[in-house]
Amino acid sequence: MSSLVYIAFQDNDNARYVVEAIIQDNPHAVVQHHPAMIRIEAEKRLEIRRETVEENLGRAWDVQEMLVDVITIGGNVDEDDDRFVLEWKN
């Protein structure tokens, strides 16, 4: 089984701020730009932090907001008000 986790977003203005935050918080992540889609993958774990997204957006942000732009995910999800984590728990 692959140990890569991934998340793919529609390529739009809202998602670009989230992608930027993911890259800031996960320097090991690989970003792939496709037509109308941005896919981010990483070995074993990706963390999306509310605080980083809020800094990029310049406003308050609820983690649930990003789900409107999510196309697909791969990995086990651990989510609370401050973060959204994808990882494989073996």
Swiss-Prot record:
Classification via Gene3D superfamilies: Monooxygenase component MmoB/DmpM
EC code(s) of this entry: 1.14.13.244
Coiled coil residues, start to end: none
GO biological process: phenol-containing compound catabolic process
Reactions it catalyzes: phenol + NADH + O2 + H(+) = catechol + NAD(+) + H2O
Listed Pfam families: MmoB_DmpM
InterPro entries linked to this entry: MOase_MmoB_DmpM (IPR003454), mOase_MmoB_DmpM_sf (IPR036889)
GO molecular function: phenol 2-monooxygenase activity
Disrupted-gene phenotype: Cells lacking this gene cannot grow on phenol.
Entry keyword annotation includes Oxidoreductase: yes
Keyword terms of this UniProt record: Aromatic hydrocarbons catabolism, Monooxygenase, NAD, Oxidoreductase, Plasmid
Pathway: Aromatic compound metabolism; phenol degradation
Functional summary from the UniProt entry: Part of a multicomponent enzyme which catalyzes the degradation of phenol and some of its methylated derivatives. DmpM is a regulatory subunit that stimulates the phenol hydroxylase activity of the complex. The steady-state rate of phenol hydroxylase turnover is dependent on the DmpM concentration, with a maximum observed rate at about 1.5 DmpM per oxygenase monomer. Higher concentrations of DmpM inhibit phenol hydroxylase activity. May act by altering the redox potential of the oxygenase. Required for growth on phenol and for in vitro phenol hydroxylase activity.
Subunit composition and interactions: Active as a monomer. Formation of dimers inactivates the protein. The multicomponent enzyme phenol hydroxylase is formed by DmpL (P1 component), DmpM (P2 component), DmpN (P3 component), DmpO (P4 component) and DmpP (P5 component).
Protein family membership: Belongs to the TmoD/XamoD family.
UniProt protein name: Phenol 2-monooxygenase, stimulatory component DmpM
Species this chain originates from: Pseudomonas sp. (strain CF600)
